[in-house]
Amino acid sequence: MEIHELQQLLSEMSLQEKIGQMVQLTGVYFDKEAVLTGVVGEQLPPEWIIQYAGSVLGVIGKDKIYDIQSRYMEQHPHHIPLLFMADVIHGCRTIYPIPLGQACSFHPELVSEAASIAASEASSEGLRATFSPMIDVSRDPRWGRVMESFGEDPYVNGIMGKAMVDGYQQKADTGIAACLKHFAGYGAVNAGREYNDVEISQRTFLEQYVKPFRMALKAKPAMVMTAFN
């Protein structure tokens, strides 16, 4: 769409539609046969959030995605399609070593090629974005997400992260949007506890934890995810 067309569309959208575009839901809310129980069933979002949601996480399979997208487009007042996203971390249908293992290869070209193949497979399923690569400098083995990272070295994280972004996004017809995460310092969570706080000096933060992002951003990833600390 041209800019003036987007501006016109935005001016016609209701406040609820605009808010909905910033919301991501899991596929369970669009599953006709799903039975929501427990905390999920008790804390259902308002119906208009489901009606106007902007993206869906974790739905795999082109038939499922087509069904959800068709039903959603039919009822949406402006027929804005859902954006389907998933954690394509180290492969989609074809599985490769975890990022920590890929880092041991010291071969960014292979890492980029693996990401390109994963993007092609994901794109064929209807996915348009992945929450990868994770380039948090990881030095505490107690942290449960160490395997998603490229390890303890800022330079290796930066080089491999850039290579992976290039692989995901290099082909216009089969590529998917990459997302650098988590900006920044998330790998230094206290006691290795997920979602915990971080206590590091400004110098350490800038020289070690921000460095991979400075390097990988040169590949122009479509997205950057903030840290949870």
Regions of interest found by a model, annotated:
Residues 1-229:
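Glycoside hydrolase catalytic-domain context in secreted enzymes
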